[in-house]
């Protein structure tokens, strides 16, 4: 039988050394498992105990019952499954049935190999006792017949204890290091509050150039000149021209101010810094001014360069005023910005570009030449500009051949570039939802309605309410068609959108920046058309709340005519001075400098204008009562009537009556 390597080997040829080690090293251990056959069977009277197995019988073979295994066998000199108790070992030695004993002095175990063990059987495991006088005597007497092998497995308890202590120390050190690093980061963050948060690009790759900007040619030309200043400064300095210090982009939201800044960054080829005005000010005092200094310090190191400040009104608001009291931190930030842009040291080579839609709240010192030398207005695009913008946004979209960008541009007056991009995107979404291969005019029209009026609702069923809404909307459309000076009808629909149960669109033939008095009176009459139709058809007691928004617009237009535009008997005087509008859209800054008598006259003038328009609308509705019933029936049947079809219905009815229906001449 082969054996694994041993640390030392002993035989009974050296008995003195063996007895010493065995007597000093054995430890008390109880029997781990006892064979069932060795236990006296309990029973009633007359029960007989079972015979004990022979010393060489395997305990787990008794009556076919298995003996529980020991969990202490791993790491023993030899793997052994069967168990033998101490008494069975003594009996086996006395019977001269033991061939070999392997002793593990650390584990206090003995692996016993029997002489007559069946082939393939495993050695027996025996737990040794603390005092073994009987075993010592037996081994002395049979030292020549029993092969003894003593092994000492390594005692790793000290090593494990050392490793455990080292692990605890390592964990403590790690915790200390983590706490120190966190505190260092916290202090570093506190110190970095004063650093600028501007995004820096050595060569800005915005993906936008001047070719991607359309509809605002005047503003684009101004900024292209700034790029030329940066690329070819000698062209201007040769004749004594100076590079402008700053360019302020002014315009309504969505008109392309930020897009222009991206185009400048993409075309200039110089270092580009971009930051929002709200990123300067923090909760700590002095942080805003420190960030301004840090921003311009970096800009001077990379001059010539561009610095873009978006929404500059967040930090450049006029000092010393405000509805909520002063803000010293914001004013300190503004003072530092003024100094950096045009102070004692100057900032040669740095061009500051800023954007805002609130130029009325900016500090006057910020707007003076030397800081923002140029103020570029980015206004709503005209019809040609809208067509060019649509062409840019339609490049990556699949349009049906029936789609005409010029027609879309004519139908979208007052739309910004962002609105037009949203219209085409909504049209593409409608096309995908309807599983069409290309965008048609139906999707474009639905997209315009979606952007202007909101999401489409569920159409009303035929009822009294639907007929009443139809008369209301036809009243608007009929007044707009028959009243000279009014914008033409674009569409009349009973399909709800947003909060409106029905809608009537009017689209001017051309972009209008000026309006005549006749046009304003016609617009007031058109707004009254819905209420007048309810009064004529259903009576004064059946009018609804549907005209609430119309009446608000009527009152605003009439008041503007009286107090601001000089279109009343009060003469050419401005009775109300517009103040700065706040962010919530209110008119807290409006001042009214007139007496109570003038206020009463203003109210009478407003009432006179509205009354005249109401009488005009009533006359048109009453003179075309049958035409109105015809149009209402058509609208209920079709739910939507386009403007051209509506005008054809009116013209065909007029021809059938052989008399003109025009009024107000």
From Swiss-Prot:
Keywords: ATP-binding, Hydrolase, Membrane, Metal-binding, Metalloprotease, Nucleotide-binding, Protease, Thylakoid, Transmembrane, Transmembrane helix, Zinc
Keyword DNA repair on entry: no
GO terms for biological process, alphabetical: protein catabolic process; proteolysis
Description of what induces expression: Slight induction by UV-B light.
Active-site positions on this chain: 473
Sequence positions that bind ATP: 251-258
Main EC class the enzyme belongs to: hydrolase
Classification via InterPro entries: AAA+_ATPase (IPR003593), AAA_lid_3 (IPR041569), ATPase_AAA_core (IPR003959), ATPase_AAA_CS (IPR003960), FtsH (IPR005936), P-loop_NTPase (IPR027417), Peptidase_M41 (IPR000642), Peptidase_M41-like (IPR037219)
Cofactor binding note from Swiss-Prot or TrEMBL: Binds 1 zinc ion per subunit.
Segments traversing the membrane: 22-42, 160-180
Chain ranges on the Lumenal side, renumbered to this chain: 43-159
Record bears the keyword Ligase: no
Residue sites binding Zn(2+) per the record: 472, 476, 550
Summary of the knockout phenotype: A homozygous disruption strain was not identified, suggesting this gene may be essential.
EC number in record: 3.4.24.-
Localization per record: Cellular thylakoid membrane
Stretches the record annotates as Disordered: 41-79
Alphabetized GO MF terms: ATP binding; ATP hydrolysis activity; ATP-dependent peptidase activity; metalloendopeptidase activity; zinc ion binding
Start-end of Low complexity biased regions: 53-63
Family membership noted in the UniProt record: In the central section; belongs to the AAA ATPase family. In the C-terminal section; belongs to the peptidase M41 family.
Annotated function: Acts as a processive, ATP-dependent zinc metallopeptidase for both cytoplasmic and membrane proteins. Plays a role in the quality control of integral membrane proteins.
PANTHER family linked: ATP-DEPENDENT ZINC METALLOPROTEASE FTSH 2, CHLOROPLASTIC (PTHR23076:SF139), METALLOPROTEASE M41 FTSH (PTHR23076)
Descriptive protein name: ATP-dependent zinc metalloprotease FtsH 1
Organism of provenance: Synechocystis sp. (strain ATCC 27184 / PCC 6803 / Kazusa)
């Amino acid at each position: 039988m082969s054996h694994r390597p041993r640390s030392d080997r002993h035989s009974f040829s050296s008995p003195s050394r063996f007895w010493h080690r065995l007597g000093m090293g054995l430890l008390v251990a109880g029997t781990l498992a006892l064979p069932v056959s060795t236990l006296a069977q309990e029973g009633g009277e007359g029960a007989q105990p079972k015979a004990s197995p022979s010393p060489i019988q395997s305990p787990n073979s008794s009556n076919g019952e298995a003996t529980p295994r020991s969990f202490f066998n791993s790491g023993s000199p030899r793997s052994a499954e069967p168990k033998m108790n101490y008494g069975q070992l003594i009996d086996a030695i006395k019977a001269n049935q033991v061939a070999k004993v392997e002793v593990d002095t650390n584990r206090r175990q003995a692996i016993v190999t029997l002489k007559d063990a069946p082939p393939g059987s495993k050695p027996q495991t025996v737990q040794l006792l603390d005092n073994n006088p009987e075993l010592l005597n037996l081994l002395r007497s049979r030292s020549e017949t029993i092969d003894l092998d003593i092994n000492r497995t390594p005692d790793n308890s000290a090593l494990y204890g050392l490793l455990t202590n080292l692990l605890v120390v390592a964990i403590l050190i790690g915790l200390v290091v983590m706490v120190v690093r966190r505190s260092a980061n916290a202090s570093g963050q506190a110190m970095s509050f004063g650093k600028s948060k501007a995004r820096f690009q050595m060569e800005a790759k915005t993906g936008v150039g001047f070719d991607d900007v359309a509809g605002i040619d005047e503003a684009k030309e101004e900024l292209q000149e700034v790029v030329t200043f940066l690329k070819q400064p000698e062209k201007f300095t040769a004749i004594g021209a100076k590079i402008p210090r700053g360019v302020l982009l002014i315009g309504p939201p969505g008109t392309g101010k930020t897009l222009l800044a991206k185009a400048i960054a993409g075309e200039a080829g110089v270092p580009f810094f971009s930051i929002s005005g709200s990123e300067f000010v923090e909760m700590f005092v002095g942080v805003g001014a420190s960030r301004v200094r840090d921003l311009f310090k970096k800009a001077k190191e990379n001059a010539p360069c561009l610095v873009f400040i978006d929404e500059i009104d967040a930090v450049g608001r006029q000092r010393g005023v405000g509805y909520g009291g002063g803000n010293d931190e914001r004013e300190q930030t503004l003072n530092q910005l003024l100094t950096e842009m045009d102070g004692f040291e100057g900032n040669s080579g740095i061009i500051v570009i800023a954007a805002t839609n609130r130029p009325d709240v900016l500090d006057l010192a910020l707007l003076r030449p030397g800081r923002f030398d140029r103020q570029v207005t980015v206004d709503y695009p005209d019809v040609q500009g809208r067509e060019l913008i649509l062409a840019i946004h339609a490049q990556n979209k699949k349009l049906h051949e029936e789609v005409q960008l010029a027609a879309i541009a004519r139908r979208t007056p007052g739309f910004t570039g962002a609105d037009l991009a949203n219209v085409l995107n909504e049209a593409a979404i409608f096309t995908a939802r309807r599983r069409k291969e290309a965008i048609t005019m139906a999707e474009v029209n639905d997209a315009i309605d979606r952007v202007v009026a909101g999401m489409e609702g569920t159409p009303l069923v035929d009822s009294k309410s639907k007929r009443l809404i139809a008369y209301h909307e036809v009243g608007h459309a009929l007044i707009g068609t028959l009243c000279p000076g009014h914008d033409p009808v674009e569409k009349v629909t009973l399909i709800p959108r947003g909060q409106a149960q029905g809608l009537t669109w009017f689209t001017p033939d051309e972009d209008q920046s000026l309006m005549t008095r006749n046009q304003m009176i016609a617009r007031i009459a058109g707004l009254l058309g819905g209420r007048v139709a309810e009064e004529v058809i259903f009576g004064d007691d059946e009018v609804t709340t549907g005209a609430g928004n119309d009446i608000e617009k009527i009152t605003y237009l009439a008041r503007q005519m009286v107090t601001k535009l000089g279109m009343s008997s009060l003469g050419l005087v401005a009775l109300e001075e517009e103040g700065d509008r706040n962010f919530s859209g209110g008119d807290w800054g409006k001042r009214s400098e007139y007496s109570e008598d003038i206020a009463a006259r203003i109210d009478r003038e407003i009432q006179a204008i509205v009354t005249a328009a109401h009488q005009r609308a009533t006359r048109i509705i009453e003179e075309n009562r049958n035409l109105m019933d015809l149009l209402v029936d058509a609208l209920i049947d079709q739910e939507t009537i386009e403007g051209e079809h509506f005008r054809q219905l009116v013209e065909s009815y007029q021809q059938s009556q052989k008399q003109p229906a025009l009024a107000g001449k």
